[in-house]
Amino acid sequence: MGAQLRVYKRRIRSVTATKKITKAMEMIAASRVVKAQRKVAASTPYATELTRAVTAVGTGSNTKHPLTTQAETVTRSAVLLLTSDRGLAGAFNSNAIKAAEQLTARLEAEGREVDTYIVGRRGAAHYNFRERKVTELWTGFTDEPTYADAKKVAGPLIEAIEKETADGGVDELHIVYTEFVSMMTQTAIDARLLPLSLEEVAEESSTQGEIRPLYDFEPSAEDVLDALLPRYVESRIYNALLQSAASKHAATRRAMKSATDNAGELINTLSRLANAARQAEITQEISEIVGGASALADATAGSDR
């Protein structure tokens, strides 16, 4: 076997092994997307009813709360960026990071200081490489987030917005995450999470023509709001974590499918080259045999004379 043919066969074996790996990763990502979508659907009724309850308390009373009160002058903002712990997801992380940087630039242009909170190792690696300050970091759960993870993330953020800016607090909280639209479309978006605009929440939760019930609050509207608002923030962060997880798995599936298809095309190309090399080798051997036979025939004819 010629040296060139051996090289082609070795490359075909290597690419075939890679194709098997990418195909397996594609199938795993596809199953995880389905699980993440189910979790989003399962959490929706709870989030909807919680939103209605918060709206009822906020709009049905004159209660003021730190999480719903807009500062007269906003001097410091917090940005929560949701990325993944792992790569191999195409432009998933880079799009989220780009959206966060654009939001940060916009807030700084308005004269605000920005504290950055990050979920996921990929986002942390980006900021650490550029020596940018990260106020707090959470990792290890981005593939399959739970409500407990959302609660862990929400705690420091709620504490920060309840503090005065002079004591290290912030005036508002923005979140940047990737919204799952479909298996083929995922969009990095930013949204202001706190302080909560009760009017916007009421519009989101209301159905046209719906008659809203009247509520009595015990022991008081203030106590109910104190209990509900942190749960509302946790549910919003949990939904964003689930959306990001589904988007990441969809991006991984798409990237691995592309890699599998490219590997198949490369195997076909290498197979054609290997066949051409084999044919050239066979042709060379036949030429050598014919040439040798011809020379032998000429030598035999000469000796007969």
From Swiss-Prot:
CDD domains: F1-ATPase_gamma. The keyword DNA repair does not apply. InterPro entries: ATP_synth_F1_ATPase_gsu (IPR035968), ATP_synth_F1_gsu (IPR000131), ATP_synth_F1_gsu_CS (IPR023632). It is a peripheral membrane protein. The keyword tRNA-binding does not apply. GO terms for cellular component: plasma membrane; proton-transporting ATP synthase complex. Produces ATP from ADP in the presence of a proton gradient across the membrane. The gamma chain is believed to be important in regulating ATPase activity and the flow of protons through the CF(0) complex. HAMAP family: ATP_synth_gamma_bact. F-type ATPases have 2 components, CF(1) - the catalytic core - and CF(0) - the membrane proton channel. CF(1) has five subunits: alpha(3), beta(3), gamma(1), delta(1), epsilon(1). CF(0) has three main subunits: a, b and c. PANTHER family: ATP SYNTHASE GAMMA CHAIN, ATP SYNTHASE SUBUNIT GAMMA, MITOCHONDRIAL. This is ATP synthase gamma chain.
